[in-house]
Amino acid sequence: MLSKALSHFPQFRFRDGEKRLRNTILKKTFVNLPEERVRLKLIDFFTKEAGIPGSRISFESQVNLAGDKSKSRTDIICYDKDFKPLLLVECKAPDIKIDEKAAIQVARYNQKVGAPFVLVSNGILDFWFKIEGEQIIPQEEIPKPFIPKNEIIRSLTYWEERAFIGHHLKPVGRAFAKTSCASLFSDPHQPVRFLSFDGFPEEFALGHYYRIYGIKENVKIGVSIAANPYGGTRLNVVLNQGGANTAFFTTSLNLIAEQENMNTEIHSSKGRSEIDLTNEAGFDLNKNIGDVVPEFHRLLLKHS
């Protein structure tokens, strides 16, 4: 089934310009890795929707398996009210296909853990199992103890903690960014991916979550709103053609709010250029972000 992590996002913190993941239970930061993002997205679901207190969640518990010379560790264990293991979770990176081997691995771990439920997830698909004796029974629906109980409140702070919105964004920009983040990233049935980019300034904040729009066959547009290490907020849009990123633009929402003329940089095989996004694409902070995607596509095609 579609992962419950799809509409959840990990918290981030900037340390000396580096964007790091923040584990809210351990109150520590970690390197921004795909598997760790999946783990923290699931934690966000468990604590915010499923109603499981952070005090009943553990990480990296050592499991000593027969014939296993390495020290295997669990990704997540959730406990019941009596602090008995309730759920064992194995996390994979989003590009890892979950197969029988992964299920067998987590089942081996569970021989030592003894949880009645097991979950294997890559953040896109969840595979739930119920353990009855020696049987591992696949579940068609999410087990009852983990059915969402709480409504998520996605306030401005929610998006700031997850590095979608920077703390220096002007008030008019905050209203746009909060509404746009909800539109882009709150629906679990819409494709969202974390994209990484090398070789560009940290100011651009390119490495973040993008809502993916299919324009036509083999043509996609990725749209992101992301905070940078300096408290700024960027609107980043990427054109992907035939599986390759061919152009992107990045704009400061504060420059848009201040009605600065040269507010946007476009990068493509043709090089770098500066434009006024308002004039070129009819964009302003009163627009619905989804309504201007066709104009973003036209603009990037023109410059690629």
Report each predicted region and the residues it spans:
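Carbohydrate-associated surface elements
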Residues: 123
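A short, conserved, highly charged catalytic patch centered on acidic carboxylates
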Residues: 1-117, 127-304
